[in-house]
């Protein structure tokens, strides 16, 4: 659909990596759904514009189901969703809260306007699409209170602004190449122990032995 209006982000400017400023912040599920897009890898394209693997519908539906079941505790959002806006000019719309104190670690506001183009999902495309699918299902089922609750939940995001699609793809590569290969063995053992002690509630994780694929 057409983007309705501007979106206000609350951000902290964190670090500069390979010439790009990285911001952390929060926006609502509603705003994310409205501004996001996916740069899918199409090997025949020249020049290449995308790098994301094809959506895994099963994974998206799993996340949507879990989202609808646990609207008070959205597990899909435990990790930040990374987005990039391919518009260097967007920096003009980011303002330090205190204009005499524009620094790393400082608070900023970003007034996003539709003419800046879409926010491309760098990491978290399945989670973002899962939230979108959950919203559609709640809408179709006329569960408007639940829909409202989901859409107004805040999401933890990591934001970059670069027109350089190669740098955007490199960010994706770094996240996936290094971060995802971590063995969760230690955490899994703690979860099993917590479950056996009755002190935690992730029974579905421990009993399904499906720890890795559920949240991605």
Predicted regions and their residues:
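Solvent-exposed functional surfaces
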Residues: 118, 133-216
